[in-house]
Amino acid sequence: MSSRYDRAVTIFSPDGRLLQVEYAQEAVRKGSTAVGVRGGNCVVLGVEKKSVAKLQEDRTVRKICVLDHVVMAFAGLTDARILINRAQVECQSHRLNVEDPVTLEYITRYIAQLKQKYTQSNGRRPFGISCLIGGFDADGSPYLFQTEPSGIFYEYKANATGCSAKTVREFFEKQYREEEVSTERGAVKLAIRALLEVAQSGQHNLEVAIMENGKPLKMLDRKVILEYLDIIEKEKEEELEKKKQKK
């Protein structure tokens, strides 16, 4: 009897749970770590890519994409392709009909509603991904949202999804400072430090994107990321030196 609750997305279990939705959330927890930081004048998204084969083109492994003037990172299954296509069409349709770009909350709500529909229909399964969505509204204000497989969404100053998301959230709660992320440099440093806390493949498979108001998405190349890594390493050494001096 219990298997019916496992298999059907439209049937609640006796304790009031939708098990298929919970399984989708478990798929997210097994995905690559993705982090987002809302800075004073930018939104930074970073992901840890899984190790690629030596002969595989690195550019084909992407966890960060652009939806019109909005940037999205995701963790979980390749279900993201469907959401990306639907969201891009919605962004273009809105721009043609209203002659204005979508707001961040509008496109986030659209993605969340699409996810929620898939938790109420037979013959479908929930989307096994969690999305971090960042960008700017027309007034120049930066925003960072996250959507879950169940269809809920929240706004954050900084957050993470994927495997080890809990560890990264705890890191953000301790390390996030408004004054430090007020600059692009500070926001990027915090995002990279968060990824390094849980990176399973070290520092070699990090992907970082910066969205600034009115500018195209900027993907940091390997050289720039290495420069940030050197700065972070030096700061760690300085902190250790200060602690030794206090003792």
UniProtKB/Swiss-Prot annotation:
Localization terms from the record: Cytoplasm; Nucleus
The keyword DNA repair belongs to this UniProt entry's keyword annotation: no
Protein name: Proteasome subunit alpha type-7-1
Keywords, sorted A to Z: Cytoplasm, Nucleus, Proteasome
Entry-linked CDD domains: proteasome_alpha_type_7
Family that this chain belongs to: Belongs to the peptidase T1A family.
Reported function: The proteasome is a multicatalytic proteinase complex which is characterized by its ability to cleave peptides with Arg, Phe, Tyr, Leu, and Glu adjacent to the leaving group at neutral or slightly basic pH. The proteasome has an ATP-dependent proteolytic activity.
Pfam families linked to this entry: Proteasome, Proteasome_A_N
